[in-house]
């Protein structure tokens, strides 16, 4: 069974221009964030969602996590419909959240992770093992006993990833996970993600980074202005330059953020 299945999923954001809000009028517009998107993600597979800002990558992840719900179409995670069975879906999904408000500032990184691991009602021994693994996998071992209130924004990002990993999810959602990591930590993190996928986890990675997609992904989804333009496997040894050229052929343009990586 596929872990994630999109069938003609559409997401629309309705809004009113500031002028009409100020005037108290109802006139406004809408933005179609996803346009009838269909794809699936299997267990033990890493999917890279590649596209510029506004392409629909983050919306896709939020729909899988049930932070948003589809306006049309069907989305199933682990066989559960995200509209009807949101609670069942959330039990299976881990999503990396880097916000300071997601953690207890006066607890250490280790203590925060222990709290979230305990929500799964696992033994203390199992929690210790999980926490040691995710601290190593995200390069936070040296900061395990540092109060979270002292963390930099980059460390918060890594702690958000660690929180998602400690849950041992069936589906892991990552949004630009390595943007604040140095090269060594990034390489180690990619190894961690590949190992996690081999444990039957479906990983969906939203990224601007061609090198990241080439290093870690099994399949590539190209999103552009809410449309899914391509869904194909990566060839063994396919380079970042090859992915960049493919993206250009599919979209006819390259976003500046994508050119730089």
Task: Please name every model-derived segment.
Residues 65:
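Helix-to-loop junction immediately C-terminal to a conserved catalytic motif
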Residues 114, 118, 125-143:
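Conserved ABC ATPase "signature" region
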Residues 168:
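Conserved catalytic motifs of ABC-family nucleotide-binding domains
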Residues 172-175:
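Catalytic Walker B motif of ABC-type/P-loop ATPase nucleotide-binding domains
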Residues 213-215:
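A short, surface-exposed alpha-helical micro-motif characterized by mixed small hydrophobic
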